[in-house]
Amino acid sequence: MLDAQTIATVKATIPLLVETGPKLTAHFYDRMFTHNPELKEIFNMSNQRNGDQREALFNAIAAYASNIENLPALLPAVEKIAQKHTSFQIKPEQYNIVGTHLLATLDEMFNPGQEVLDAWGKAYGVLANVFIHREAEIYHENASKDGGWEGTRPFRIVAKTPRSALITSFEFEPVDGGTVAEYRPGQYLGVWLKPEGFAHQEIRQYSLTRKPDGKGYRIAVKREDGGQVSNWLHHHASVGDVVHLAAPAGDFFMNVAADTPVSLISAGVGQTPMLAMLDTLAKEQHTAQVNWFHAAENGDVHAFADEVSELGRTLPRFTAHTWYREPTEADRAQRVFDSEGLMDLSQLEAAISDPAMQFYLCGPVGFMQFAAKQLVSLGVNNENIHYECFGPHKVL
């Protein structure tokens, strides 16, 4: 526990943190990667270049300082970060490295004096121990499961299937021929790659896209402009290649009773965690209402449409609606979509009126903000809205 003086000293630095903003974390990362370049093998350097990780870390530091007297308020954020850390296989000793560079950054940017540095050192130590403890629990849980493992495990690509102009699915089975751990629908896999030509090992998280079967895993990857890993997977990865996977993880997952109505709302590749949820609901013969609401640019980039239709036909109460923002002439001729333009949930108000309904959202942050705002305006409680950000977390 932190003493009152330490808490007061840390809270007194909040105005300085806010004034400095992500410049603080930019300095921190530049310093850390200069002194510990081996960490480039763990961190997503694309998120470093676009500034997303710097913003996410700054928000986390500011939130910790603001809630230092009420640590339970931070537990949801801790769980989200701890789950992601296990996908990167973060170890306790790496927290010491981060702590060293955080304190050095505060000193170099602000020269706040030893009392402030000591207070932040104590505060960081408490937070680091919370993460270390929770991550140890997750590692143990993953290793103890039937088909579970520690660290990473080699898997072979057994199928590679184009699903749209931008999205390709990959199926993996373990090289050792053993079973694989189950997961909750909505969770992701950590994919570890360092093909020839990569400057650093790259680790990415991709949502699992079907109900667990104990034999293997399936993900779907969108080819991003300039995306090193996604382009390698699309253009170079082949059936028979071996990749290393960290065990399934993530705090975003569906957990509902058979009589709970569910809405799965997505845009673009954000449908991937929803596919695992829909597959689970279908195979478990979910009895309550299930809605599938999806937005895509057009039919060329709309993946898994046939699979969704097939799964929907097995559910007793299923409603699907698809919006194309800019449908092609072929889309219009074939009528493969329901509405043109942006997603408008007021069109389906009757289908989402049950106050017990749980809503799961995934897609670009702007889309999720747009969809969540509509849901709230239609009377949905915020507590019933669950969402996943691909990349560093953002608050809707």
UniProtKB/Swiss-Prot annotation:
Question: What binding details are noted for the cofactor?
Answer: Binds 1 heme b (iron(II)-protoporphyrin IX) group per subunit. Binds 1 FAD per subunit.
What's its EC? Answer: 1.14.12.17
| Active site positions, chain numbering | 95, 135
Region (Reductase), start-end ranges: 147-396
Any one Pfam family match given in the protein's UniProt record, by short name: NAD_binding_1
What is stated about domains?
Consists of two distinct domains; an N-terminal heme-containing oxygen-binding domain and a C-terminal reductase domain with binding sites for FAD and NAD(P)H.
Q: What is this protein called?
A: Flavohemoprotein
> What organism is the protein native to?
Salmonella paratyphi A (strain ATCC 9150 / SARB42)
The encoding gene: hmp
